[in-house]
Amino acid sequence: MLIKASFFILISIFYFCDAEIKLIQATIRHSDRNPIDGSSAFLFYPKDPYKDRDWYPDGPMELTNKGKLRAYNLGKLLREKYKDLLGPIYKPSSVYFKSIAMTRAINTAHLVAAGLFPPSSSQIWNPNLPWIPIPVYSVPTEEDVMNYAMMSCENYSIDRKKAAQEVDRLLEVIGDVQDFFDYLSLNTGVNHTRPIQGWILYHQLAAYASLGLELEPWTDKIFPDGKLVDISAIEYILQTYTDRMKRLMGGIWIKTFLDHVDDLLSGRNVERKGFFYASNEIQVGAILNTLKVYKPHIPGYASTLIFELHESNDEYYVKVVYINENNLTEFVVPGCESSVCSLETFKKVLKNVTMQSFDIDCGRKGNFSIIDL
């Protein structure tokens, strides 16, 4: 069996040597941001030493200068990696940028676009400003089914409540969580009992660390590594716990990619080669867990998950590439021969978690809060 598997891996790699990349779809977490405001911080971190700051001039949760630079540099990295596919200049027909309706994500998309497409000589309109405007599309949150099924679908809410019953079992794997929750409660000033509280705390501490602010000594035991990450990571598992949740959170992104592939291969849209979606780390984590490649971690600022379509000898292949904290990983999706997965195998092994009908999986649409679960 091992010999057979190794044979298929060698064959796929051999055929892939002369492969041509045909299309990419990238899901990008927004870049470094300011912390949340004091009124919100008080709800989960009353002892927060920075809760009275207003984060002038950009405001709470908006991109910092460090975040702006990181997003721009991500665009430059993507330019280097995909320059042959995307071509030397920006053309509206060849790429598409879309963002969730949050300014930190919208601005991340604009900055990635700026790094990805510096103006050619014919596109320079101001010699002192090497930049061209590139549109970033967005829809209102209540219409954004790709990013907010968790808050708009009754079936998701039903499954999330069922998943919540598994929290204790997941926490047992980590061990000694009650002492840890007691430690968090003592130092934050709020009673910690659920993974989502640790998840929120992690993101606040990450925002402070990104700004270079001094963290309180008690955080040394839990941040940036340690049990806080392990407990926070449970949230990504809970968000995609059932196959239906996977379809609503991660499978809808797989379907979108496959729809783009179908448009290309059928000739409906042969010009557009790059699709870039600015979102948040929830979506990145959801896609990873839906693909069954997620390992406990918090997707970092500007982390990017990319589906690549390649063609070799009239056969099509998919690669899943993950850029996180300056590391690039090519995943082997379970059921695929290697990180180079034939398109048909990719579809087959992910069939149960690929969105087929949003209306059926979603059920009644409404306004449901994951914080209450």
PLM region spans:
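Signature for phosphate-centric chemistry
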Residues: 19-96, 100-373
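Cleavable N-terminal signal peptides of Sec/SRP-targeted secreted and luminal proteins
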Residues: 2-19
